[in-house]
Amino acid sequence: DELLEATKAITKNLNIEISDKNLNYLINNSKRDIKNIFRTLTQLEKESLERKKSIGLNLIKEIIQSS
């Protein structure tokens, strides 16, 4: 899937650590456009740094619901 590969490239470039399982969840449960996914990833990174926690499924769900 091109969207998955593009999203993996974004996470690599931004040094965001997220499992493939969680990345797939993000793609499958949010708007499937690269701008939205990029915005969500940057928000996930910000929240994970503020909370000093890794990016997990609960945080992904929270961010998706708030957007």
Residue ranges and their predicted role:
Residues 33, 40, 56-60:
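Short, hydrophobic-biased amphipathic alpha-helical segments
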Residues 48-66:
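Conserved C-terminal helix/linker of AAA+ ATPases
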